[in-house]
Amino acid sequence: MNSSDFKKSFKESTENNSNTYRPSKTLNTYKSLKNGNNIANSLIIQLNNNVNNNLNKEKLIKSNNNKLLNLNNNNKNNNNNNINNNNNLISKNGILNNIIKNENQNKILKGNNKNNSNSKLDVSKKSISKENVNYLVSGSIAGAISRSATAGFERLTIIQQVQGMSQNLSQGYVGCIAAMKEMVKREGFKSIWKGNGANIVKVSPNSGIRFLTYEFCKKHFLDNSSNHPSSSSIENGIDGNGVGCGSGSEMKMTVPQTMFSGAMAGLTSTFFTYPLDVVRIRLSLQGSCSNDYAAHRYNGITHSFFKIHKDEGVKGLYKGLGTSIASIVPWVSISFATYEGFKIICKKMILNYQISSSSLSTTTTTPSSINNNNNNNNKNNNSFIYENELGENGINLTNTSGCSTMASTMPSSLLINSVASDENELKKGVNMICDFVCGALSGAVTMTVCYPLDVLRRRMMIQGIGGNKVLYKNGWDATKKILSNEGLVAFYHGIIPAYFKVVPTVAISFAVYEICKDLGSNKYQQK
């Protein structure tokens, strides 16, 4: 109640009670009303205060709620982080468990591998050792047979190579057949095999080590290469594939790899068997003519070793080793490379012949098929592609050739079957002939290229025997002195009997090696 209302009510009360107006009562009424007004104002103030307090409380509640929401969000984030951390820990634990499992599995596998590896290693070692033994034995047998078959030409070659070192040439051997007859006349029929015992003792391990080293290098290159066709492969220009060595192999070596393998084979075999070669040559020379180099000094292989060691020391057993390595390493390198190349060409020719003969003998056509095939041939430039993989023979051929109408009408399956049916015949008979022919060609090429180095090797090996003068300081000095004293022709003395010796020797050696290797591998497979 405000003052205006109060005045109005006061006026009305005075008017109504004008007859009974009492100032004291009016004053009391005014005071009570004023007190009421004050009370009302205080109540209003309290209400306002309460409202403000409520508003403040609502704000506090809202702020608290916001804080709680923030806390909840933070808790949610923390929970999510904890979940992520737990997931990470779980994944890490899983990874660690997998690693531990893998390690345990590896340990188990290693344990098994040790058993397997011991079984595999035992098997692989056994197989490797069996293979190595097979290579070694096959090469040794091949060397012994091939050198025994050509022992007379071997001895005659050595005599003619070194007889120019003597001042007395009146009793020297000249020619090939005539010299062989003269040798038999002078020394008897057994003279053909004089020194052959030492020759076999030297050549047999030499040949075995040579083939073993070559196969080892070949396996190393095959295991560490992708075997992609190379432009430098030995049959480049034929079919673009790699070198194939021997029946049953699937070699794809390049020419440098093949030559390197051959060089390592020659180096290893020469170093380990060189003293035997020195003994062999000295035994072959003695008694051949009346010069000092041919005098009888040695009574067999054992006596030769001890006498050379006693008279000349260990150096005597390795005299001319540098020159020998310089001549034998390229010799063996070229020999293997040419053999591999000729073998691929030979088998390719045989297969081409079989393909053409099979197609001509098994195909018949009609006039309509001829016309249709003529159209097809025009589209294909009158050519067809025949692909055949003969793993047993190590051949991978892609032959593209023009063919007749009859051959072009033959189904490819019939052509493949007809060739496959002849595969056994190829493996049985033709393989040996192919190996023999390729070995002979390889021997002829190698002999022509490397013969001068062989002359140097032999002369360096025998100089100084029996107190004779040492003529040459080294291989280069020997080359200059031979050219100045005897001429270029001296480097080819004895090459005719050498051809008679080397060509069949290399041919027999490769052919016998392949046969023995196949027989040995078949026995191991059966076991």
Swiss-Prot record:
Residues 1-14 have a biased composition (Basic and acidic residues). One of its GO terms (cellular component) is mitochondrial inner membrane. GO terms for biological process: adenine nucleotide transport. Residues 1-132, 209-258, 346-435, 509-527 are mitochondrial intermembrane. It is found in: Mitochondrion inner membrane. Solcar repeats lie at residues 130-220, 253-345, 430-519. It comes from the Eukaryota. Keywords: Membrane, Mitochondrion, Mitochondrion inner membrane, Repeat, Transmembrane, Transmembrane helix, Transport. It holds the Pfam family Mito_carr. Residues 1-29 are annotated as: Disordered. Residues 15-29 have a biased composition (Polar residues). It is a multi-pass membrane protein. The chain crosses the membrane at residues 133-153, 188-208, 259-279, 325-345, 436-456, 488-508. One of its GO terms (molecular function) is nucleotide transmembrane transporter activity. InterPro entries: Mit_carrier (IPR002067), Mitochondrial_sb/sol_carrier (IPR018108), Mt_carrier_dom_sf (IPR023395). Residues 154-187, 280-324, 457-487 are mitochondrial matrix. Signal peptide: none annotated. Belongs to the mitochondrial carrier (TC 2.A.29) family. Mitochondrial solute carriers shuttle metabolites, nucleotides, and cofactors through the mitochondrial inner membrane. This is Mitochondrial substrate carrier family protein V. It comes from Dictyostelium discoideum. The gene is mcfV.
